């Protein structure tokens, strides 16, 4: 309901939470579609757009696309230092992915 009626920053936030809950339900493809909508149409609300990239990284990992997952998260860390909380969240996700992958792949360094 909120997502349908909201505009501006509230719409961006509503889309973020829609993507978040779809990710939590392991509906990674649908979650990425919501993230893409947010980025395409509400990128002026940078906080929510950047925060949604972390969800996208988690979605890619859920879809077993480690390369895309790490690429997205590394770019958040590298390019959006003005959002400390989001960078911290992206770093936590990236570290978790690298740790999991290091257990099954010797070419991946956990740090």
Show where each model-derived region lies:
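Acidic, polar-rich low-complexity tracts and alpha-helical solenoid repeat scaffolds
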Residues: 1-111
